[in-house]
From Swiss-Prot:
It comes from the Eukaryota. This is Delta-hexatoxin-Hv1b. The keyword Membrane does not apply. One of its GO terms (molecular function) is sodium channel inhibitor activity. Its main location: secreted. Lethal neurotoxin. Slows the inactivation of tetrodotoxin-sensitive voltage-gated sodium channels (Nav) by binding to site 3 of the channel, resulting in repetitive firing in autonomic and motor nerve fibers. GO terms for cellular component: extracellular region. Gene3D superfamilies: 4.10.40.10. The presence of a 'disulfide through disulfide knot' structurally defines this protein as a knottin. Expressed by the venom gland. Belongs to the neurotoxin 06 (delta-actx) family.
């Protein structure tokens, strides 16, 4: 996993979902439509 505030790609959604969620709340991420989609796609 990369920096905690890094951009979230598909691989990192599965690798570090919490990192992706944090970035999404900061509007720095490009997560799936919903948080649950991160888990479903893994």
């Amino acid at each position: 996993c990369s920096r905690s505030d890094g951009w979230c790609g598909k691989t990192e959604d599965c690798c570090c979902p919490m990192k992706c969620i944090k970035a999404w709340y900061k509007q720095n991420g490009n997560c799936q439509n919903t948080i649950s989609a991160i888990w479903k796609n893994c």
